[in-house]
Amino acid sequence: MTLGDEIRLLLEAPTMNASDVRTLLRRDHDEALQIARDMYESESGDERRALFKRLKPVLAAHSRAEEREVYDALLSKTTDEGQDIAHEGYVGHGVLDDLLERMARSRKTESDEWKAHAKVLVELLARHIEEEQGEMFEALAEQFNDDEREAMGRRFLAAKSRMAMKAKAA
């Protein structure tokens, strides 16, 4: 976490409560990025594989729930800028999904090529998160009131739970 991130957290803290969708998204982002970094930094192919198996469903559930409850809300309610943010989010998730699928097809988690894929995943994920926690969080604050963001947070958690249960069943 950069100094700028820490300052932003401190400034947002008074306006973000535990059920605000931005707080929930930030928690998910932190968890996913940490798993991805641990996976990339691991020297063990077996550990990379285990971390990847943990990361993939976490990202899938988060992404689908975020698309359904956050991006779609931005598309339906906000300005052109908010809609652009949502469209970019969908594209970013698609790129991450494609990379995750490519990594899932490779069984050689100990290889330099797989580690290169993991590094690119970390970089893409970090950039995607940075954009969301900047532009998207700002759009959410401007376009939705506290009650709407809390309701969005509840719907996000419910959707994420449904997506996680689907992933387990598959």
What positions do the PLM features span?
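Small-residue-biased structural context
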Residues: 1-170
